[in-house]
Protein backbone atom coordinates (compact mmCIF):
# COMPACT_ATOMS: atom_id res chain seq x y z
CA UNK A 1 0.00 0.00 0.00
CA UNK A 2 2.86 2.35 0.84
CA UNK A 3 4.46 1.76 -2.58
CA UNK A 4 1.16 2.50 -4.33
CA UNK A 5 0.82 5.76 -2.39
CA UNK A 6 4.33 6.93 -3.37
CA UNK A 7 3.86 5.93 -7.00
CA UNK A 8 0.54 7.80 -7.23
CA UNK A 9 2.07 10.84 -5.52
CA UNK A 10 4.87 10.93 -8.10
CA UNK A 11 2.48 10.53 -11.03
CA UNK A 12 0.13 13.24 -9.74
CA UNK A 13 3.05 15.63 -9.16
CA UNK A 14 3.82 15.37 -12.89
CA UNK A 15 0.43 16.94 -13.64
CA UNK A 16 0.68 19.69 -11.01
CA UNK A 17 1.15 23.14 -12.49
CA UNK A 18 2.53 26.15 -10.69
CA UNK A 19 3.90 29.53 -11.71
CA UNK A 20 7.59 29.26 -12.54
CA UNK A 21 10.33 31.53 -13.75
CA UNK A 22 12.25 29.94 -16.61
CA UNK A 23 15.23 31.19 -18.57
CA UNK A 24 14.11 29.81 -21.93
CA UNK A 25 15.61 26.34 -21.61
CA UNK A 26 13.88 23.72 -23.72
CA UNK A 27 13.89 20.12 -22.50
CA UNK A 28 15.29 17.93 -25.24
CA UNK A 29 16.01 14.69 -23.38
CA UNK A 30 14.68 12.68 -20.46
CA UNK A 31 17.41 10.43 -19.09
CA UNK A 32 16.99 6.82 -18.02
CA UNK A 33 19.12 5.42 -15.18
CA UNK A 34 20.45 2.43 -17.12
CA UNK A 35 24.05 1.75 -18.21
CA UNK A 36 25.02 -1.37 -20.15
CA UNK A 37 28.44 -3.02 -19.85
CA UNK A 38 30.61 -2.21 -22.90
CA UNK A 39 28.01 0.32 -24.09
CA UNK A 40 29.15 2.75 -26.81
CA UNK A 41 27.05 5.58 -28.12
CA UNK A 42 27.25 8.12 -30.92
CA UNK A 43 24.52 10.72 -30.61
CA UNK A 44 23.25 13.59 -32.73
CA UNK A 45 20.41 15.75 -31.45
CA UNK A 46 18.73 18.58 -33.32
CA UNK A 47 16.74 21.15 -31.38
CA UNK A 48 14.64 23.86 -32.97
CA UNK A 49 12.08 26.15 -31.38
CA UNK A 50 10.38 29.44 -32.20
CA UNK A 51 11.66 32.61 -30.49
CA UNK A 52 9.54 35.57 -31.49
CA UNK A 53 10.04 36.17 -35.23
CA UNK A 54 13.05 33.86 -35.51
CA UNK A 55 13.69 30.23 -34.80
CA UNK A 56 16.47 28.96 -32.58
CA UNK A 57 18.51 26.02 -33.86
CA UNK A 58 21.02 23.92 -31.92
CA UNK A 59 22.76 20.63 -32.63
CA UNK A 60 24.59 18.34 -30.22
CA UNK A 61 27.14 15.77 -31.29
CA UNK A 62 28.32 13.26 -28.70
CA UNK A 63 30.40 10.17 -28.20
CA UNK A 64 30.17 8.09 -25.06
CA UNK A 65 31.01 4.73 -23.64
CA UNK A 66 30.74 2.85 -20.39
CA UNK A 67 33.96 2.88 -18.39
CA UNK A 68 32.59 0.50 -15.74
CA UNK A 69 29.57 -1.80 -15.70
CA UNK A 70 27.52 0.97 -14.09
CA UNK A 71 29.19 4.23 -15.26
CA UNK A 72 29.01 5.88 -18.69
CA UNK A 73 30.88 9.02 -19.81
CA UNK A 74 29.83 11.14 -22.82
CA UNK A 75 31.58 14.07 -24.49
CA UNK A 76 29.42 16.66 -26.29
CA UNK A 77 30.15 19.42 -28.79
CA UNK A 78 27.26 21.89 -29.10
CA UNK A 79 26.64 24.17 -32.06
CA UNK A 80 24.04 26.94 -32.33
CA UNK A 81 22.85 29.44 -34.89
CA UNK A 82 23.56 33.03 -33.81
CA UNK A 83 21.60 36.25 -34.46
CA UNK A 84 23.35 36.67 -37.85
CA UNK A 85 22.21 33.15 -38.94
CA UNK A 86 25.77 31.80 -38.69
CA UNK A 87 26.12 28.32 -37.25
CA UNK A 88 29.14 27.84 -34.98
CA UNK A 89 30.51 26.06 -31.92
CA UNK A 90 28.82 27.28 -28.73
CA UNK A 91 29.72 24.88 -25.89
CA UNK A 92 31.51 21.73 -24.72
CA UNK A 93 30.14 19.23 -22.20
CA UNK A 94 31.26 16.17 -20.27
CA UNK A 95 28.46 14.04 -18.87
CA UNK A 96 28.62 11.05 -16.52
CA UNK A 97 25.70 8.71 -15.88
CA UNK A 98 25.95 6.40 -12.87
CA UNK A 99 23.51 3.49 -12.44
CA UNK A 100 22.96 3.14 -8.68
CA UNK A 101 20.73 0.04 -8.72
CA UNK A 102 20.47 -2.96 -10.99
CA UNK A 103 17.33 -3.02 -13.12
CA UNK A 104 14.52 -4.59 -11.08
CA UNK A 105 16.60 -4.86 -7.89
CA UNK A 106 14.33 -2.51 -5.92
CA UNK A 107 10.80 -1.18 -6.42
CA UNK A 108 12.26 1.46 -8.79
CA UNK A 109 15.50 1.91 -10.71
CA UNK A 110 17.79 4.78 -9.67
CA UNK A 111 20.75 6.60 -11.15
CA UNK A 112 22.70 9.85 -10.98
CA UNK A 113 23.82 12.27 -13.68
CA UNK A 114 26.74 14.70 -13.42
CA UNK A 115 27.52 17.23 -16.14
CA UNK A 116 30.16 19.91 -16.62
CA UNK A 117 29.71 22.51 -19.38
CA UNK A 118 31.81 25.42 -20.70
CA UNK A 119 30.41 28.02 -23.09
CA UNK A 120 32.79 28.61 -26.02
CA UNK A 121 34.64 31.99 -26.04
CA UNK A 122 32.87 33.20 -22.88
CA UNK A 123 33.57 32.93 -19.18
CA UNK A 124 30.40 30.95 -18.49
CA UNK A 125 30.53 27.61 -16.69
CA UNK A 126 27.80 25.22 -15.61
CA UNK A 127 27.76 22.17 -13.39
CA UNK A 128 24.73 19.90 -13.07
CA UNK A 129 23.94 17.02 -10.75
CA UNK A 130 20.73 15.10 -10.86
CA UNK A 131 18.75 12.12 -9.72
CA UNK A 132 17.34 9.73 -12.35
CA UNK A 133 14.31 7.58 -11.53
CA UNK A 134 12.42 4.97 -13.53
CA UNK A 135 9.53 2.74 -12.52
CA UNK A 136 8.12 0.08 -14.82
CA UNK A 137 4.66 -1.38 -14.23
CA UNK A 138 3.47 -3.84 -16.84
CA UNK A 139 3.58 -2.14 -20.23
CA UNK A 140 4.08 1.35 -18.81
CA UNK A 141 7.10 3.16 -17.46
CA UNK A 142 7.59 6.48 -15.73
CA UNK A 143 10.94 8.29 -15.92
CA UNK A 144 11.62 11.35 -13.77
CA UNK A 145 14.75 13.52 -13.71
CA UNK A 146 15.45 16.10 -10.98
CA UNK A 147 18.47 18.35 -11.57
CA UNK A 148 20.29 20.99 -9.55
CA UNK A 149 22.22 23.36 -11.86
CA UNK A 150 24.79 25.99 -10.88
CA UNK A 151 25.99 28.59 -13.42
CA UNK A 152 28.86 30.99 -12.81
CA UNK A 153 31.47 33.13 -14.54
CA UNK A 154 32.33 36.73 -15.40
CA UNK A 155 29.90 36.82 -18.35
CA UNK A 156 26.85 35.60 -16.42
CA UNK A 157 25.21 36.27 -13.10
CA UNK A 158 25.88 33.38 -10.72
CA UNK A 159 22.70 31.41 -10.23
CA UNK A 160 21.33 28.13 -8.97
CA UNK A 161 18.45 26.46 -10.81
CA UNK A 162 16.30 23.38 -10.39
CA UNK A 163 14.94 21.47 -13.35
CA UNK A 164 12.46 18.62 -13.52
CA UNK A 165 11.75 16.39 -16.50
CA UNK A 166 9.28 13.52 -16.83
CA UNK A 167 8.26 10.95 -19.40
CA UNK A 168 5.42 8.44 -19.20
CA UNK A 169 5.52 5.65 -21.78
CA UNK A 170 3.18 2.87 -22.82
CA UNK A 171 4.65 0.01 -24.85
CA UNK A 172 2.08 -1.14 -27.40
CA UNK A 173 3.77 -4.41 -28.35
Q: How should these model regions be labeled?
A:
Residues 2-10:
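Sec-dependent signal peptide recognition
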Residues 21-173:
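Transmembrane beta-barrel domains of Gram-negative outer membranes and organellar outer membranes
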Residues 17-18:
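N-terminal signal peptide c-region/cleavage motif recognized by signal peptidases
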Residues 10-11, 39:
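Short linear sequence elements within intrinsically disordered, low-complexity coil regions
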Amino acid sequence: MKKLFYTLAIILSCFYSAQTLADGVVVDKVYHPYVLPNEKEVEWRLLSHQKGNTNSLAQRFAYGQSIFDNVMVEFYIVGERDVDDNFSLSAYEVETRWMLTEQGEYWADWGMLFEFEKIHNKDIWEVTSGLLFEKEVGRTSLSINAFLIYEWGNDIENEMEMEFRAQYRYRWI
